């Protein structure tokens, strides 16, 4: 399992970090900037391709949802922000959103639908 997550992170973290990358090695994705919006759209595509229902709320937060089989009204939410400060690092908030998505995707693949709904949020 650890090998799976290491490989998944090594493959997806550089991809996610490429949005808003700056020449000094950091990235800049200020809230509601074109870079932030592009990141949200691309992350939405990835979550949808993995079988999650995706949606944006009225302020732009992105959700990826896997409905529960027994208690769908009970929701477990995990994630983080994907905006950055100027020249931010790639292990800032985006890692929390990415880790939540990778964990839900792995659990879905291994065990199928959860009893309770699980949701990823990228803010």
Tell where the protein language model's regions lie, with residue ranges:
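Fold-independent oxyanion-binding glycine-rich loops
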Residues: 58, 80-82, 123
């Amino acid at each position: 399992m650890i090998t799976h997550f290491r490989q998944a992170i090594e493959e997806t973290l550089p991809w996610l970090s490429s949005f808003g990358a700056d020449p000094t090695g950091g990235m800049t994705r200020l809230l509601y900037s074109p870079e932030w919006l592009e990141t949200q759209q691309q992350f939405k595509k990835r979550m949808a391709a993995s079988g999650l229902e995706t949606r944006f709320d009225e302020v732009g937060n992105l959700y990826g949802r896997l409905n529960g089989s027994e208690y769908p009204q009970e929701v477990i939410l995990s994630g983080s922000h994907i905006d950055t400060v100027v020249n931010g690092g790639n292990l800032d908030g985006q890692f929390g959103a990415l880790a939540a998505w990778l964990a839900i995707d792995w659990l879905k693949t291994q065990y199928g639908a959860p009893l309770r709904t699980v949701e990823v949020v990228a803010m």
